[in-house]
């Protein structure tokens, strides 16, 4: 029985890539800078001391970081026994966004340029805004700018509740984000508005990767909170990802846990499981791994590293999340059967010590474990697509166009 489990620690980069300067990210290092802050006692909120990741270290995390940067992260054991195969991978795609990283992991790099809304204020074309107001029968809109999602709620949340005007905003990513109150505006109405926005952006040729529904609750600035009912409306990958090949060529199954299905616009997904928060995502993943049959991929995105701690530049929170993940990791490994493989990786960086609030262009770790996987270094990889090619080879599928199998 063959099964593959893919675990994406969203934004867990391990050091700037050679082309990071082009993105303003030269010197960024999500893991390295978190470890450095922990070792200096600068991340002792809710946790304490050096970054403690013994299980990920045994799989080769510290060694992968050394391969990418030339050094072992501060406080981590560079001499630990290695039980997994490890590599560090460079992104071939043109961006440093979630769809690009995930599509490339599944064998389809993004070799075109996404569209972006680059103006910090008055970010969106008036023609687009007018169409949204007309089609969705809106009283107007708020925002129309670049912002962090939590900051804009404090700035505009109360006005949104009073006026019923949705909050439109974007970032350095190829996104159109809409924040609305779940109760006063309505969750279904927000989803309908996002569908309209997706249609207008596609028909208008804006080439925007995602429309993101950002529902929130609360009654005043300071206590607004985003809920777990986020929904991403992505465009489809330009060619079949390895997930779809497994379904089409082997009649296989692909289980999405978390936001995976949204990222791939449901391409190749046969079952969707929603969960919010690290522990809930872990619990859902464990349940699906236990139930998975032959020719199945269980694919989980652990979004909190990115959304809760990376973008918010919360070093201590990110460190605590990593340590929680590491403590629970053995629960996943014990479910890996004789012919199974489990892969731990990331889709980009989001260094919580870096300027601004955006992603960082970094190498990602590729940590592979399985009873038949030979431990040791798999070296530098030129593309994340090596993961997709490995999965294709493992299941006996036709070759992906990009990538070389890890083994």
Swiss-Prot record:
* Gene Ontology terms describing biological process: 2-deoxyribose 1-phosphate catabolic process; 5-phosphoribose 1-diphosphate biosynthetic process; metabolic compound salvage; nucleotide metabolic process
Which keywords does UniProt give here?
Cytoplasm, Isomerase, Manganese, Metal-binding
Subcellular locations according to the entry: Cytoplasm
Q: What is its EC number?
A: 5.4.2.7
Tell me the GO molecular function terms: magnesium ion binding; manganese ion binding; phosphopentomutase activity
Q: How is the cofactor bound?
A: Binds 2 manganese ions.
Name the chain's protein.
Phosphopentomutase
What organism does the record attribute this protein to?
A: Cronobacter sakazakii (strain ATCC BAA-894) (Enterobacter sakazakii)
């Amino acid at each position: 029985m063959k099964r593959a489990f893919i675990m994406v620690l969203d934004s867990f980069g391990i050091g700037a890539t050679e082309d990071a300067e082009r993105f303003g990210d030269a010197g960024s290092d999500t893991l390295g800078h978190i470890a450095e802050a922990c070792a200096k006692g600068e991340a002792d909120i809710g946790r304490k001391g050096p970054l403690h990741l013994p299980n990920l270290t045994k799989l080769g995390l510290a060694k992968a970081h050394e391969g990418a940067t030339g050094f072992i992260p501060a406080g981590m054991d560079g001499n630990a026994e290695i039980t997994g195969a490890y590599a560090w991978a460079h992104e071939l795609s043109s961006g440093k966004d979630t769809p690009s990283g995930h599509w490339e992991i599944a064998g389809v790099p993004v070799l075109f340029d996404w569209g972006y809304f680059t103006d910090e204020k008055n970010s969106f074309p008036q023609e687009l805004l007018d169409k949204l107001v007309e089609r969705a029968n809106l009283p107007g809109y708020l925002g129309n700018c670049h912002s962090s999602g939590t900051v804009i709620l404090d700035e505009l949340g109360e006005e949104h509740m009073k006026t019923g005007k949705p909050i439109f905003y974007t970032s350095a990513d190829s996104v159109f984000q809409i924040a609305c109150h779940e109760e006063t505006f309505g969750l279904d109405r927000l989803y309908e508005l996002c569908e309209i926005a997706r249609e207008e952006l596609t028909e208008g040729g804006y080439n925007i990767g995602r429309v993101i529904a950002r529902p929130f609750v609360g009654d005043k600035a300071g206590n607004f909170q985003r809920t777990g009912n986020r929904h991403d409306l992505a465009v489809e990958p330009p060619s079949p990802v390895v997930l779809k090949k497994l379904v089409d060529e082997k009649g296989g199954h692909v289980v999405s846990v978390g936001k995976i299905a949204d990222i791939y616009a449901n391409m190749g997904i046969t079952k969707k499981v929603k969960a919010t928060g690290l522990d809930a995502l872990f619990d859902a993943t464990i349940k699906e791994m236990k139930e998975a049959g032959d020719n199945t991929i269980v694919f989980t995105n652990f979004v909190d590293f990115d959304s809760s701690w990376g973008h918010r530049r919360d070093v201590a929170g990110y460190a605590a999340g990593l340590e929680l993940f590491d403590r629970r990791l053995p629960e996943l490994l014990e479910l890996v059967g004789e012919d199974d493989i489990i892969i731990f990786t990331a889709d980009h960086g989001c260094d919580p010590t870096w300027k601004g609030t955006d992603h960082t262009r970094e190498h990602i770790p590729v940590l592979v474990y399985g009873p038949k996987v030979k431990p040791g270094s798999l070296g530098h990889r030129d593309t994340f697509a090596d993961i997709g090619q490995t999965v294709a080879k493992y299941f006996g599928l036709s070759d992906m166009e990009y990538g070389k199998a890890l083994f």
